[in-house]
């Protein structure tokens, strides 16, 4: 290679020298532009800061000017605050821009000249950056926490500053667990709000055997003075209802103690709302004369009397309390926002051990201001919010807030057997209003005869319903398109109260607790749910999960903490419901039944439980419970006996209910038969009439036990007398198209509710009305001696009284029957006079039969009788001899001159019968027997000519009218009638009815006219369902004799 000549080298150096000045010039221009941009940004920022300071000064001036006019500034200032905060955010985003050229100096590090220039410019840049950073920190102090960015330098700085409040801000807030939008105190314009402090819980406290029942004491202190905050109105009670007038400051309030031993938990959960009846905006004002409020929370515990006597350190304690920890909360934060409407987590601190040095300030304030804060290893959860005071607060035995009146004592209420409206009528808004029920305590229940109103049960009807024990609420398990709600209606107004939503399928059963504060429901969605009966409570209180359908659920009568459920898996489960615990506890499972459990019931005391399954087996349990130890008592439940009757073996049991006397059990089975079983001898009485082969139907007994109601698959409600087994009434014209599923009788009123599960089926309520009963009695008097007809409605309602059954309001005929059985001597004395009267009546028979008519209603206020499947027909002479009231007999009408009544029907004995008991009557073939009443289909009560009386078989006799053509043969004991002879007397009967149906003038001298010869009597025979009435006349007898055979 050729060596380079000096000329070449010089030329190369000149080229380099020529290029170097151009590069230096470009770098210098870049530096100048960067510095100019920094200067412009700093100038703009300083200008913005000056503008903000000017605005702040203007705000202070405006506040002072408008201080006398209003407590709060106008909305324009709030708008200015929002604009200013937005501008701060924008400027903060632009501030980090100048740091970019500083972070990349690699462009200028190639030459020594550039390095020197950089060194000269560094102090100048650093001064600008320090000023910007310092101003950034000032701005960050005024920006809310949720809006300020967190650069790395700022984080390091905060960590370095905090020593004892490492995770807390200056307001005492450790963490905001439920963040709401920040609340500015200027936005709180509602003066009706008062301060409410909700104490939730703490984390686990430090293990200490001396802590057994902690509580929280809340102080409201002024930061300026260190004393309790002065009241806005000195005459207004803030902490206590009986607050003295000379107390002009806000007194502290304590929560209820949390007993670790009783509640079996070391994690205190008070969940208590403490209300300070002070104007809430007053505590949040930013004026100089207004207090700057700090809330202090002390966790305390009781000192026992032994500790107070023996412990010398008690002198340092206050009022016999052991101080465990304390916390504080500033209502107004350093960022200008209020620490309210959010669940806050406050750091707890140990109380100082040194004694108080300042007696003129609150002790907790001295801890906060003078003493070092030593962290306690736990936190406290609180929520502060403004509350609107309700217009009406129910009084209580003990006043729990400043607005609650203290009234009465438990001892007074027990002595007078009175309870507060808070206890007797939960869940009602107008519980102070007393309802006067028409049915008096101990009075017999009546059959409701008047339609009260209809209630909406949803698109698919109602499956079950039940009145509360106080009678003020009707709970109905309904079905709609969207779900299966429990609808609560107020009684007696029928007003809708609220819906309880939660079930996902059909609700089979529901039951009220003894105090009506809880309601339990069972459903085919595999759950049983417990609901609180409170005004604003619509959600589920407890859920009891099951593996399959739940058919029944009941509260134990002795305690509302126990719920018993019956499930499709043949298990009976006992659950404990505790208000302090989050979930229900399954105490025990009873696996005895071999098929799914359909129904469960208890007696009134709760000593016995009865469970029925799908194969007809009833198990009786001993279920005594000690209220103080519920779980242990449940483990001792045992089987008393099993009832396996052959009559309903294999037949599903739909419903069980204990009779009010506690000695009998109502059994509703799916064989269309109801039974009431005597639990002592296991003998049952049957009630037939209601069809039930497929559906689950609930029947019910009235609270007095004198009536039995049951629905049917034919849409009719049947009513029986449990004592006699007789059907006393039926509701035949109800508007139900589906099966009547459930019936509930009101516990304090003569009221009943019906429901059906079907498309748009309503809930019907009927009530007993005395005026309606009187109208029915007047209507039935026109039938003059006949019993109520099966198609007669009471005041266009659906209640029908069966022809063989009495009206539900009168018991006079029953008394007459009992009197007649017990006074046979009086009857024998009357017989002789009765025979003479009968002879007089027979002599006038022809005249009476010609003048019979029913064109005018009979006068007189006689009431409709009550009889037992029988006729009680006699004369006025018998009435006077027996000393009984006129209303005890059926439609006896008086004329102006002569009294005519239907005598007892006469029958003829067809066969001989010898009495086997003392109360029976011996008869011979051909004897004429006078029938007084018919006990049942097989046995009648009557007397023969000789004066002997007693019961005789009904199938041994025939009507005397069959022998009217040959009376001498009857006396000679003629042979039994042949079927041909039986049909002969019936032929003239039809023609005779036709002739008697024509209207004839009424003879005013005559008294009553027999119904058998009137148009109404004819209509009665047409409407009578399966009851045969033989009506014949005799030439020698003035009155028609009737015999009704009840099938």
UniProtKB/Swiss-Prot annotation:
| WD repeat positions | 457-499, 502-541, 545-585, 592-631, 648-687, 691-730, 735-776
Instruction: List the signal peptide residues.
Output: none
Other comments on record = Is targeted by provirus integrations. This deregulation contributes to tumor development.
Described function: Involved in vesicle trafficking and required for ciliogenesis, formation of primary non-motile cilium, and recruitment of RAB8A to the basal body of primary cilium. Component of the tectonic-like complex, a complex localized at the transition zone of primary cilia and acting as a barrier that prevents diffusion of transmembrane proteins between the cilia and plasma membranes. Involved in neuronal differentiation. As a positive modulator of classical Wnt signaling, may play a crucial role in ciliary signaling during cerebellum embryonic development.
- UniProt keyword Cytoplasm, yes or no: yes
Q: Where is the composition biased (Basic residues)?
A: 149-159
Query: Subunit structure, per the record?
Result: Self-associates. Part of the tectonic-like complex (also named B9 complex). Interacts with MKS1. Interacts with NPHP1; probably as heterodimers and/or AHI1(2):NPHP1(2) heterotetramers. Interacts (via SH3 domain) with the dynamin GTPase DNM2. Interacts with HAP1; probably as AHI1(2):HAP1(2) heterotetramers. Interacts with RAB8A. Interacts with CEND1. Interacts with SPATA7.
InterPro entries in the record, alphabetically?
AHI1_SH3 (IPR035832), Cilium-Associated_Jouberin (IPR052803), SH3-like_dom_sf (IPR036028), SH3_domain (IPR001452), WD40/YVTN_repeat-like_dom_sf (IPR015943), WD40_repeat_dom_sf (IPR036322), WD40_rpt (IPR001680)
Q: Quote the PANTHER family the UniProt record gives.
A: JOUBERIN
Every SH3 domain range: 902-962
Q: What is its main location?
A: cytoplasm
Effect of inactivating the gene: Mutant mice, when surviving after birth, show retarded growth during the postnatal period, but do not develop severe cerebellar vermis hypoplasia or ataxia associated with cerebellar dysfunction. Adult homozygous knockout mice have a small body size, with slightly reduced brain size compared with wild-type and heterozygous littermates. The overall brain morphology appears normal except for a smaller cerebellum and underdeveloped vermis with a mildly defective foliation pattern. Vermian lobules VI and VII appear fused, whereas lobule V appears smaller and underdeveloped at 3 weeks of age.
Basic and acidic residues bias locations:
1-17, 29-40, 77-86, 115-138, 172-181, 963-987, 1013-1040
Give the originating organism: Mus musculus (Mouse)
Residue segments, region Interaction with HAP1: 1-284
> What's in the GO CC field?
adherens junction; cell-cell junction; centriole; centrosome; ciliary basal body; cilium; cytoplasm; MKS complex
Source species, domain of life: Eukaryota
What is the annotated tissue distribution of the protein whose record heads this document? Expressed in the retina (at protein level). Highly expressed in the brain. Highly expressed in the testis. Expressed in the kidney, thymus, heart, lung, spleen. Weakly expressed in the liver, stomach, pancreas, and embryo. Strongly expressed during periods of both cortical and cerebellar development.
Q: Which residues carry the post-translational modification Phosphoserine, per the record?
A: 853, 974
The protein depicted here goes by the name: Jouberin
Compositional bias segments (type: Low complexity): 96-106
Q: In Gene Ontology terms, what is a biological process of this protein?
A: central nervous system development
